[in-house]
Amino acid sequence: MSSHTSAGSIYKQQDLKGMKVYPEHYVKILLLLGEKLVAQFDRFRVDYIMCGGTLLGAVRPPHKFIPGDYDLDFELLCTPGNRKRFFELVKHVRANPVGCGINCVLHLPTVVKFVPEMARELARRFGLNNPSIPNPTADVFITEPRRGGGHKIVGCQWPKWYYKAGEIFPLQTLAFSGLTWCAPNTPEKIFRRYYGKTWRIPEHYAWPTSSARTQ
């Protein structure tokens, strides 16, 4: 049996066990949010990589959004001038949310959360701001150099999520639900460190009890 079929079978088994699956139209909104955010990354020359469940979905067959996930995860790289360029992006988005199609909420020093920018009536039609379903968000985690090389997330509550020297560069691009985004050179190493040897087997984690609200 192929790994693609195996992963699909496991997802189906989890669905039968009551795993919450992110609604299809929420996934479409989320992917469009990610596409718009990455366009801003490119515009402002921001160096980034996928991380967390997004990177896991890109690496593990079928290379797409994990059904039980509920957001997108990116990390800001510690390259020269990158943090300055990123916050220029943040300033631009906050000043032009309608034109960018996205907005953001600062949870510094750790993360900036990007959300879709849409009229309240449109959000209502899409069923957003539902307390039982996390709204689509794209989290960009701020990083800092790590002693001995590599980087870690500022104020990170996940001590095993870090990169050693040589695990990030050279960057690669990976397909994720039909999109192509930047990824670290050796993602398997961080997965083994963070999730353990069974990282290829899908596992469901509970959704948060609250979500960022869209406008």
Residue ranges of predicted features:
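Juxtamembrane luminal stem/stalk of type II transmembrane Golgi/ER carbohydrate-processing enzymes
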Residues: 1-21
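Short, well-structured secondary-structure segments
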Residues: 6-9, 26-29, 46-57, 200-203
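Conserved catalytic core of two-metal-ion nucleotidyltransferases
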Residues: 19-42, 90-184, 188-193, 202-215
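Active-site nucleotide-donor binding segment shared across nucleotidyl transfer reactions
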Residues: 38-72, 79-83
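Tryptophan-centric aromatic hotspots in well-structured domains and transmembrane helices
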Residues: 48-49, 53-54, 66-68, 169, ...
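A structural signal for short, well-ordered beta-strand segments
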Residues: 53, 74, 138-140
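Solvent-exposed residues in well-ordered beta-strands and their adjoining turns
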Residues: 77-79, 143
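A solvent-exposed, acidic/Ser-Thr-rich amphipathic alpha-helical stretch
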Residues: 86
